[in-house]
Amino acid sequence: MTNTRRSDFDVTNSVQVSSPKAVLAAVQALYRPTWPGMSLDPLTRAFAHFERLFAGEVPGYYGVDTVYHDRQHTLDITLALARLIVGYERQQEESARLGGARATIGLVTGLFHDVGYLRRADDHASQNGAEFTRTHVSRGARFLEEYLPVLGFGAWVPVASEIIHFTGYEVPFEHIEAKVADPRDIMVGHLLGTADMIAQMADRCYLEKCRDRLYAEFVLGGVAIPMNDGSPQVKYASGLDLLRQTPEFVSEVREKRLERDFRAAYHYLEILFGGSNPYMEAIDRNLDYLRQVLRSENWQLLRRRPPIFAATTDPMATMRGLMVGHIKRVWSGN
């Protein structure tokens, strides 16, 4: 194994997180000894459906066309979630353990947590999934309401369609916790929300992806230049401006989401890694490097160009064209 972390591998440089088959194998290796005798067929079926869905091979859906929230993004988070779930389970008394069914539902929810970015065939007004940035979690919840019964988990719909919102900003967390009765389900939600944050911030190319890809999605999603009383308000002026605000964002995520809202659940990883936490260490390295770049203003230090795992041809060129057109329309008032 190479010592240099590859751009589409996890924080340990051992699992190719652009590959559904590789991530499924890693999940199975974690789940089998933790819940011996439990059938992993639902997970196998879910991963197969995920692969077809994101490739645009499921009737009624277009494939993934978002450049930041691509296939690798989801799979990286899914692997982190599996590790968190298993790490948690191995440290609990029996009464607090999740059990195999809940662990499976949690992972399936994680696997499809960003499915709301996929355009449906009846989304006639949209040109790119990034346009659903503000509503993608609710769209994902509706997908789970349809898909979980097909997978044989219809009874879990009320839970899954709530805890998916721990990955977003559409529903206040206290509202979720008021509706979900079992504290073990809340814990799965906290593990899911934790995985969503730490895996992407630990990505080897997180900084370049924020500048080049996330900013473009934020433009199309109305986040970078939101409208206020019919007038555009600039939140992020450019990809570089987004990077300048990233240290503050990461600090806020760590303090408010990871530590407070999710009860420092990231520590459950440490039993799997001899007491260390490779995700948090990678986040620290990314932040240290970003501060170096910001001090020097030498943006050429961010020169990685990792592949995009989308279903469309040249998705970045398409995204840039849509972004430029959107910005022109915003400032022209059309």
What are these regions (language model features)?
Residues 2-37, 83-102, 112, 169-334:
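Divalent metal-dependent phosphate-bond-processing catalytic cores, especially two-metal-ion Mg2+/Mn2+ enzymes
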Residues 35-38, 42, 66-69, 183:
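Non-transmembrane, amphipathic alpha-helical segments
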Residues 46-50, 54, 106-110, 160-168, ...:
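Short alpha-helical scaffolding segments that buttress acidic/His motifs in well-ordered protein cores
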Residues 51-80, 122-130:
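Active-site flanking loop/helix segments enriched in acidic
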Residues 69-73, 98-107, 132-136, 183-190:
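Secondary-structure capping and boundary motifs in well-ordered enzyme cores
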Residues 74, 81, 136-174, 232-233:
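Histidine- and acidic-residue-rich, metal-dependent catalytic cores
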Residues 77, 104-125, 140, 161-170:
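His-Asp-centered metal-binding catalytic motifs of divalent-metal-dependent phosphohydrolases/nucleases
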